[in-house]
Regions:
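NAD(P)-binding Rossmann-fold cofactor-contacting core
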Residues: 27-40
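Aromatic pocket-lining residues of Rossmann-like dinucleotide-binding sites
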Residues: 20
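Conserved N-terminal Rossmann-fold NAD(P)-binding element of oxidoreductases
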Residues: 4-8
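C-terminal catalytic/substrate-binding lobe primarily of soluble NAD(P)-dependent oxidoreductases
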Residues: 132-342
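ADP-ribose/adenylate-binding Rossmann-like module
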Residues: 79-97
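N-terminal Rossmann-like NAD(P) cofactor-binding module of classical short-chain dehydrogenase/reductase
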Residues: 63-67, 87-89
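Rossmann-fold NAD(P)-binding glycine/threonine-rich loop
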Residues: 91-111
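Hydrophobic/small residue at the entry helix of a nucleotide-binding pocket
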Residues: 12
Length: 342
């Protein structure tokens, strides 16, 4: 079996390491935090250190998962591409990964980016909707990971880097409206709606469409993040008085608190399709860790299987072949995604 190096072993990276190891792959786990890395000693070779060019050069593998925070993720993906690696890239960065497409081609490297739930699985479902229904009059993604119950405070805990969440709340949102890409303020177009068996939630625009702005044929295309009502009101009220460090502490993960990940992808063209993901997690990991990590693991297996493909690609470039592998990975991990027949 192939050896896979996983860069970053937070909640999602940890799940990826354990899943790939259980599937028989040799895994090398790398992180700067010794305390979280030590939890993986039983399933992987572990390396404690800062990910840099020297560390990458020391690793005897061509398959990498970039699960680093967005602020460092782009710098590392460039190093990996220059060295001709195959990369499943989970780092959500302000930089466009396609900037290094030619670099990847020149170095016989392949990088598939945005390999999570949204962006990631959402891209593949929209591509499938295009295949079924032609040009979409509307494509809509609503997605979020939240505690199962509301509280008197933030009603939130960050399932990935809290710093990335803050950037999500501040980066202007690019959407498609009337067939054109337009930019709107983050957190705008707030709407309350009901989730079956969950209750009333609130959705607001965030900049998660990324590659599908170019790859999906649609008259209108939007992505919204979902939170409990009151969360964004509190953020808007307190964002000037709280530092980044304050928010990181306030949104820290509580492993004992029940949580869920929910996503709806709705598409209408010549016909319509709706997919709903609703997951509570299990004893092996949080809902966001496993719903995200399973997509990343499917991409790793796709990269190992495919030969002679180079460049930087969003997942939807590989259409139904990759979608089937992702859905199979979900099924294997008992993650339910339901298509609603309309």
């Amino acid at each position: 079996m192939e050896t896979v190096a996983v860069l970053g072993t937070g909640l999602v990276g940890n799940w990826i390491v354990r899943s790939l190891s259980s599937d028989g792959y040799k895994v090398i786990a790398i992180d700067a935090d010794k305390s979280i890395l030590s939890r993986l000693n039983d399933v992987a070779d572990t390396i404690h250190g800062i990910v840099d060019e020297d560390l990458i050069n020391s690793l005897d593998t061509d398959i990498f998962v970039n699960a680093l925070p967005g602020r460092v993720g782009h710098r590392i993906r460039k190093i990996l591409v220059e060295k001709g690696k195959k990369i499943a890239d989970l780092a959500f960065t302000p930089e466009d990964p396609l900037e290094i497409n030619q670099l990847a081609i020149d170095n016989d490297s392949i990088l598939i980016y945005d390999v999570g739930v949204a962006p990631g699985l959402s891209n593949l479902l929209l591509k499938e909707a295009n295949r079924r229904h032609g040009r979409l009059s509307i494509g809509r993604i609503r997605v979020g990971g939240n505690p199962t119950t509301k509280d008197d405070g933030w009603s939130y805990m960050a399932p990935f880097s809290p710093v990335d969440v803050i950037e999500e709340y501040t980066r202007p949102a690019r959407i498609i409206r009337n067939g054109e890409v337009v930019t709107l303020p983050a957190l705008s177009e707030r709407i309350r709606f009901e989730i079956s068996e969950r209750g009333e939630m609130e959705a607001f625009l965030t900049d998660g469409l990324r590659s599908v702005l170019q790859t999906i044929d649609a008259e209108e295309l939007i992505e919204s993040t979902v939170r409990w009502p009151g969360h964004i009101d509190m953020y808007l009220k307190k964002k000037e008085e709280l530092s980044e460090e304050d928010l990181v502490k306030a949104w820290s993960w509580d492993t004992n608190r029940p949580e869920f990940t929910w996503m709806e992808v709705y598409a209408r063209g010549e016909g319509n399709s709706t997919w709903i993901l609703d997951d509570n997690g299990d004893e092996k990991g949080s809902s966001m860790a496993r719903t995200t990590g399973a997509i990343t693991c499917a991409v790793v297996k796709f990269l190992i299987k495919e030969k002679g493909i180079y460049g930087v690609h969003p997942p939807e470039n590989f259409g139904n072949d990759l979608l089937e592998m992702c859905l199979n990975e979900y099924s294997k991990n008992n993650i339910k995604i339901n298509e609603i027949k309309n």
